[in-house]
Amino acid sequence: MASGVTNRNPAFWRQSPFMRTLQTLLFIFLLSPAVLSQNKPLHGIDTSDLDRKVDPCTDFSEFANGTWRAKNPIPASMDRWSKRWQAGETSKGQLKDILEALPAKRAKGSTEQIVGDFYGACMDESRINARGIEPLKPWFAKIDAAKDVAALQPLMAEMHDIQVVVPFVLSSQQDFHKPTQVLADIGANGFNMPDRDYYLKPDDRFREAREKYLDHIAKMFKLVGWDDKSSAAAAQTVMTMETKFAEVSLDRVVLRDPSATDHNSTFAQLHALAPHFDWAEYFRHKQLPQDVDMNVDQPKFMEEFDRQLQQTSLADWKVYLKWNLLNSAAEALPAPIEREDFEFNGKYLSGTSEMKPRWKRCTEQTDRYLGEALGKKYVEKYFPPEAKARMQEMVRNLLMAMRDDILTRPWMSDETKERAMAKIATFNPKIGYPDKWKDYSKVDIRRDVFFETNLASRQFVVEDDRETIGKPVDRGRWGMTPPTSNAYYNPLLNEVVFPAGILQPPAFYVSATDAVNYGAIGVVIGHEISHGFDDQGAQFDYLGRLRNWWSDNDLKQFHERGACVASQFDNYFIEPGIHHNGKLVLGESIGDLGGAKVAFLAYQKSLEGKPRPANIDGFTPEQQFFIAWGQFRGDAIRPEQQRLMVQTDPHPIAKYRVIGPLSNLPEFQKAFQCRPDSPMVRPPDKICEVW
């Protein structure tokens, strides 16, 4: 009899015990009118999003999100979509409401005037179109007036002032060896396509990208009045110069190693790398003394920059600078230029078929350049105090769980554990918004001229950064704006930062069960804390210094465990012939693996001394935890954006951010009663465990 049942539906019996129970429950639920009428989230988990036809032990990402993705196609103006991205779009709508509700009369220099007039100028598309390229002409005229390459160098400094930072960029950076001090950092920035491989690799997709880029450059020059022949020649000039800079630029995997860009230098050493650039005049323009502490990220790049100053013609340098100015300023220029910019960067590279509506583009720009002014208004209206208090408690619990986890690592010596404890003890969490807001009152924001207003706001960003150079580090500064739906870890400050924008569903629910919040925002917290001990963060000690604090054997074991994670992700294919680069995504993957484990431990610890929470909708608290994580990372993504991510992004695509870490966790296997041979259970000899 049993064999007969198996023959009729053999797949049913190969499924996990949990999946068989779930399908039986689903059959009962479908007979219940009460269940049919109930289609709303409960404590943060919307069970209607689950694809119950999929065994969670086979593909947990599809189980957690399959129905939601089927019902929610990616909007035409987005390159990916999920509840998390939906929440980000909700935040933009909230910012729009703030901006459009500002009073008509605003005092000059007030927050309301600064953000309101910037947004209003950006929204005045008819005036932007009517002005045409007139605002760009004075810049082009300055470039045209140069009699030799040396005469272009002061213009490079002026362009750097408005964030047109080519072919190098000067910015602030904490000293890797004295992180209490801020030094001047000279970085490479010689090309505009997403990655050096787009210029150098012979693969068909990269060859096609080069052809599309040439066509795009030519179209952009034609839109500012150049003829077909001149535009095509200019495109080839830009491609030639950018390719030369790409050839000497470090690749993204190498750039993940802090020591690869750690080159503390003097003014004399910088001058020796590029003696044909007038560094004395450049530093004078930037109001920096020549004896300022500095770092040169890529010395070989600076040597190539010097060669190009000698070998590239004046005419070609002029084209290169004009292109970078035009490319950077497209967001503030007439609609045809902005549209062509989208055609290449949005449609071709990322796969989006429509531009975002203008109000979204203008809201994004306001946040990008005037983020703390707008953010102050945002937190006043949308960030409840109880959210910050709940987050502070969760961060404390996650830090304690990370501490306990490290202390139980059998492969670490007591000496290394003690140093790790010092790092845990000095973690500095920042939640919601900065204690002190930036002062934008002197920024010349005008409602009637968007191009100039856009450049004035950019100049503020550059000057605000430059003014920190040569001074003690200000630990109160933030690297993200309050409305940002993201988080980050800074190893030089040993801080984890969670802006207000991420502290909303689906990451965080004030009224949710602990299982849901620990599974979503808890894993995010654990992820950021784990960055302090990933392949990059582990190179910095508790004071933020780039210094080895590991014993030789412990470091060897750590690298071996990291290699396991890299190998796992090397084998995740996006499409035939294209797979993740495990070394590129190693840090984020260690963060996801450590974050999921530590958050689960913290959740378990939070239950000590309390009655066991009840099941909800047939799901145990442990299952709710993992579903919350799966749904937080439940992105749908366009193929073009997926290819771009695999090439350039240190984050794996969302599917593998769910499947990858969970398939290593016995806690997940136990929660869903997965068979040992299930796809979501890695073989014992393949399990990766770092933390």
Could you describe each region identified by the protein language model?
Residues R20-F27:
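Sec-dependent signal peptide recognition
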Residues L102-N397:
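Noncatalytic, helix-rich "gating/capping" subdomain that lines the substrate-entry/channel surface
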Residues D49-A70, Y199, D203-K222, L586, ...:
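Hydrophobic/aromatic-rich, well-ordered segments within soluble, folded domains that form packed cores
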